[in-house]
Amino acid sequence: MKKGKHNSITDVKGIRVGHCTLESEHLHTGVTVVLPSHDNIFQNKLIAASHVINGFGKTTGLLQINELGTLESPIALTNTLSVGTVQQALVQYMLSIDKTIGKETGTVNVVVGECNDGYLNDIRACAITQQHVFEAIQNANIIFEQGSVGAGSGMSCFEMKGGIGSGSRIVTLNQKDYTIGILVQVHVLWHWI
Protein backbone atom coordinates (compact mmCIF):
# COMPACT_ATOMS: atom_id res chain seq x y z
CA MET A 1 0.00 0.00 0.00
CA LYS A 2 1.05 3.55 -0.68
CA LYS A 3 2.36 5.56 2.29
CA GLY A 4 0.97 8.95 3.24
CA LYS A 5 2.96 12.15 2.62
CA HIS A 6 4.83 11.94 5.96
CA ASN A 7 4.19 8.23 6.71
CA SER A 8 2.67 9.44 9.96
CA ILE A 9 -0.64 9.60 11.82
CA THR A 10 -0.64 13.31 10.99
CA ASP A 11 -1.28 12.46 7.34
CA VAL A 12 -4.89 12.15 8.53
CA LYS A 13 -6.30 15.66 8.10
CA GLY A 14 -6.36 17.73 11.29
CA ILE A 15 -4.26 15.46 13.51
CA ARG A 16 -1.21 16.87 15.30
CA VAL A 17 1.13 15.24 17.84
CA GLY A 18 3.20 16.85 20.58
CA HIS A 19 5.63 15.67 23.23
CA CYS A 20 7.14 16.81 26.48
CA THR A 21 10.17 14.73 27.50
CA LEU A 22 11.80 14.58 30.93
CA GLU A 23 15.36 13.24 30.74
CA SER A 24 17.91 13.20 33.55
CA GLU A 25 20.03 10.65 35.39
CA HIS A 26 16.98 9.02 37.00
CA LEU A 27 14.10 10.34 34.88
CA HIS A 28 13.20 8.95 31.47
CA THR A 29 9.54 9.74 31.07
CA GLY A 30 7.17 12.19 29.46
CA VAL A 31 3.84 12.96 27.87
CA THR A 32 2.69 12.50 24.28
CA VAL A 33 -0.54 14.18 23.16
CA VAL A 34 -2.55 13.52 20.01
CA LEU A 35 -4.71 16.49 19.02
CA PRO A 36 -7.25 14.90 16.67
CA SER A 37 -8.77 18.10 15.29
CA HIS A 38 -8.20 21.84 14.87
CA ASP A 39 -11.86 22.39 15.81
CA ASN A 40 -13.32 22.48 19.31
CA ILE A 41 -13.48 18.70 19.62
CA PHE A 42 -15.99 18.89 22.48
CA GLN A 43 -18.49 20.69 20.24
CA ASN A 44 -17.47 18.74 17.11
CA LYS A 45 -17.02 15.21 18.43
CA LEU A 46 -15.31 12.62 16.25
CA ILE A 47 -16.52 9.09 15.58
CA ALA A 48 -14.38 6.73 17.66
CA ALA A 49 -14.08 3.20 19.00
CA SER A 50 -11.63 1.33 21.18
CA HIS A 51 -10.47 -2.24 21.53
CA VAL A 52 -8.50 -3.48 24.52
CA ILE A 53 -6.10 -6.38 24.02
CA ASN A 54 -4.13 -6.06 27.26
CA GLY A 55 -6.65 -5.38 30.02
CA PHE A 56 -3.87 -4.67 32.53
CA GLY A 57 -3.63 -1.00 31.54
CA LYS A 58 -5.00 1.97 33.45
CA THR A 59 -6.45 3.86 30.49
CA THR A 60 -9.16 6.44 31.23
CA GLY A 61 -12.07 7.46 29.02
CA LEU A 62 -12.53 4.30 26.94
CA LEU A 63 -15.85 3.19 28.46
CA GLN A 64 -17.64 6.33 27.27
CA ILE A 65 -16.08 6.00 23.82
CA ASN A 66 -17.42 2.44 23.61
CA GLU A 67 -20.85 3.54 24.88
CA LEU A 68 -21.33 6.68 22.76
CA GLY A 69 -18.97 6.06 19.84
CA THR A 70 -17.39 9.51 20.01
CA LEU A 71 -14.13 11.18 21.03
CA GLU A 72 -14.37 14.64 22.62
CA SER A 73 -10.83 15.38 23.84
CA PRO A 74 -7.19 15.02 22.91
CA ILE A 75 -5.60 11.64 23.65
CA ALA A 76 -2.61 11.64 25.99
CA LEU A 77 -0.03 8.95 26.78
CA THR A 78 2.20 8.92 29.87
CA ASN A 79 3.54 6.62 32.58
CA THR A 80 1.33 4.56 34.88
CA LEU A 81 1.62 6.70 38.00
CA SER A 82 0.96 9.94 36.09
CA VAL A 83 -2.45 9.07 34.62
CA GLY A 84 -4.33 11.12 37.24
CA THR A 85 -2.17 14.21 36.75
CA VAL A 86 -2.44 14.03 32.97
CA GLN A 87 -6.19 13.40 33.14
CA GLN A 88 -6.70 16.52 35.27
CA ALA A 89 -4.50 18.59 32.93
CA LEU A 90 -6.59 17.51 29.92
CA VAL A 91 -9.76 18.46 31.82
CA GLN A 92 -8.26 21.92 32.52
CA TYR A 93 -7.27 22.27 28.85
CA MET A 94 -10.76 21.36 27.68
CA LEU A 95 -12.36 23.77 30.18
CA SER A 96 -10.12 26.53 28.80
CA ILE A 97 -11.24 25.98 25.19
CA ASP A 98 -14.95 25.39 25.87
CA LYS A 99 -16.75 27.53 28.47
CA THR A 100 -19.96 25.46 28.20
CA ILE A 101 -18.49 22.28 29.72
CA GLY A 102 -20.13 21.54 33.07
CA LYS A 103 -22.41 24.60 32.82
CA GLU A 104 -24.60 24.41 29.72
CA THR A 105 -23.55 20.88 28.75
CA GLY A 106 -22.36 17.74 30.48
CA THR A 107 -18.83 17.12 31.63
CA VAL A 108 -15.95 16.14 29.36
CA ASN A 109 -14.54 12.64 28.85
CA VAL A 110 -10.75 12.80 28.47
CA VAL A 111 -8.64 9.88 27.25
CA VAL A 112 -5.30 9.00 28.86
CA GLY A 113 -3.30 5.85 28.14
CA GLU A 114 -0.25 4.61 30.02
CA CYS A 115 2.67 2.22 30.14
CA ASN A 116 4.85 1.43 33.13
CA ASP A 117 8.25 3.00 32.44
CA GLY A 118 9.65 1.96 35.84
CA TYR A 119 12.43 -0.13 34.27
CA LEU A 120 14.18 2.97 32.86
CA ASN A 121 12.52 5.74 34.89
CA ASP A 122 12.18 6.48 38.61
CA ILE A 123 8.41 6.19 38.33
CA ARG A 124 8.01 6.75 42.09
CA ALA A 125 9.24 10.33 41.62
CA CYS A 126 5.86 11.13 40.01
CA ALA A 127 7.69 13.82 38.03
CA ILE A 128 4.99 14.60 35.45
CA THR A 129 3.08 17.83 36.15
CA GLN A 130 0.10 19.47 34.47
CA GLN A 131 2.52 21.97 32.92
CA HIS A 132 4.22 19.10 31.05
CA VAL A 133 0.86 18.21 29.48
CA PHE A 134 0.28 21.83 28.44
CA GLU A 135 3.79 21.90 26.94
CA ALA A 136 3.06 18.76 24.90
CA ILE A 137 -0.16 20.37 23.63
CA GLN A 138 1.75 23.56 22.70
CA ASN A 139 4.36 21.46 20.87
CA ALA A 140 1.77 19.62 18.77
CA ASN A 141 2.52 19.74 15.07
CA ILE A 142 2.15 17.77 11.85
CA ILE A 143 5.87 17.00 11.88
CA PHE A 144 6.85 15.47 15.23
CA GLU A 145 9.76 13.56 16.67
CA GLN A 146 9.63 9.77 16.98
CA GLY A 147 11.63 7.33 19.08
CA SER A 148 12.66 7.90 22.70
CA VAL A 149 10.53 11.01 23.23
CA GLY A 150 7.51 12.01 25.28
CA ALA A 151 5.67 9.02 26.68
CA GLY A 152 8.08 6.79 24.74
CA SER A 153 11.10 8.03 26.68
CA GLY A 154 11.00 5.25 29.27
CA MET A 155 9.78 2.42 27.05
CA SER A 156 11.65 -0.86 26.56
CA CYS A 157 11.03 -3.81 24.29
CA PHE A 158 12.58 -7.20 25.14
CA GLU A 159 15.38 -5.33 26.96
CA MET A 160 15.94 -3.09 23.91
CA LYS A 161 14.82 0.53 23.61
CA GLY A 162 11.17 1.12 22.79
CA GLY A 163 9.46 4.43 22.09
CA ILE A 164 6.94 6.29 19.93
CA GLY A 165 6.43 5.41 16.28
CA SER A 166 3.95 6.31 13.58
CA GLY A 167 2.90 5.44 10.06
CA SER A 168 0.17 5.91 7.48
CA ARG A 169 -1.22 4.17 4.42
CA ILE A 170 -3.53 5.24 1.61
CA VAL A 171 -6.37 2.84 0.88
CA THR A 172 -8.81 3.07 -2.00
CA LEU A 173 -12.43 2.13 -1.51
CA ASN A 174 -15.07 2.67 -4.20
CA GLN A 175 -12.56 4.74 -6.20
CA LYS A 176 -11.96 7.13 -3.30
CA ASP A 177 -8.68 7.42 -1.36
CA TYR A 178 -8.67 7.31 2.44
CA THR A 179 -5.73 7.82 4.79
CA ILE A 180 -5.25 5.48 7.75
CA GLY A 181 -2.79 6.66 10.39
CA ILE A 182 -1.38 5.05 13.50
CA LEU A 183 0.69 6.11 16.49
CA VAL A 184 2.28 3.39 18.62
CA GLN A 185 3.96 3.40 21.99
CA VAL A 186 6.19 0.32 21.84
CA HIS A 187 6.67 -1.36 25.20
CA VAL A 188 6.87 -5.15 25.52
CA LEU A 189 8.09 -7.29 28.41
CA TRP A 190 10.33 -6.00 31.14
CA HIS A 191 13.60 -7.61 32.10
CA TRP A 192 12.06 -9.29 35.17
CA ILE A 193 9.23 -11.05 33.32
Where in the sequence are the language-model features?
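Alpha/propeptide regions of enzymes that mature by internal proteolysis
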Residues: 1-193
